[in-house]
Amino acid sequence: MKPLTARQQEVFDLIKAKIDDTGMPPTRAEIARELGFRSANAAEEHLKALARKQVIEIIPGASRGIRILLQDADHHDEELGVPLIGQVAAGEPILAQEHVESHYKVDPGMFKPQADFLLRVNGESMKDIGIMDGDLLAVHKTQDVRDGQVVVARVDDDVTVKRLERKGSMVFLHAENEEFSPIEVDLTSQSLSIEGLAVGVIRSTTWM
């Protein structure tokens, strides 16, 4: 990624500060006023330059349509917060940039072990242990997991959250809801990879 000019860095820092302070990015007019540009159009040109350098994403049709990308110039990921993973494309790494919906200002160290990413829960298969549809599941990225732990697993190209049980060449991914049967994986004919260990839950209504 190309380095930012001094002016572009000012614009970027202002965007980040506004999001940190208010939870929302600034409008073009606010950027122009804060940084002394003659017009909102001048601010727009700087935003386009930042988008070309893949520091931000411009969302069309919204006055505050600016999203900071995870990889952002000289700022470290931890400054942005924990990445929230949305839909995971088949065959792609779970932390691939295109999977990151946004990021949350939570301290990764509040979870043990620390959270490397958040995954939006889809469905009620784990509701009996308090993991509800729409919650944000805090996940520590690791393949070092034990039977009985709740893991994020990829079976072929599907990502799921279940309790792990291994028996020889068979793996059973158990739901925590009696309405759901275990997912059975035969390692002799199917692929399975562990994406991480569930380390906590953030109730979505608190954060959205």
Curated annotation (Swiss-Prot):
Keyword flag Cell cycle: no
Entry's Gene Ontology BP terms: DNA repair; DNA replication; negative regulation of DNA-templated transcription; proteolysis; SOS response
InterPro entries, per the entry: LexA, LexA-like, LexA/Signal_pep-like_sf, LexA_DNA-bd_dom, LexA_repressor, Peptidase_S24_LexA, Peptidase_S24_S26A/B/C, WH-like_DNA-bd_sf
Annotated GO MF terms: DNA binding; serine-type endopeptidase activity
Pfam families: LexA_DNA_bind, Peptidase_S24
Positions of the catalytic residues: 125, 162
Class of this enzyme: hydrolase
Domain of life: Bacteria
Residue spans binding DNA: 28-48
Keywords: Autocatalytic cleavage, DNA damage, DNA repair, DNA replication, DNA-binding, Hydrolase, Repressor, SOS response, Transcription, Transcription regulation
Its EC number(s): 3.4.21.88
Subunit description: Homodimer.
Family: Belongs to the peptidase S24 family.
HAMAP family: LexA (MF_00015)
NCBIfam families for this protein: lexA
Protein name, per record: LexA repressor
Species lineage: Bacteria, Pseudomonadati, Pseudomonadota, Gammaproteobacteria, Vibrionales
Gene from which this protein is expressed: lexA
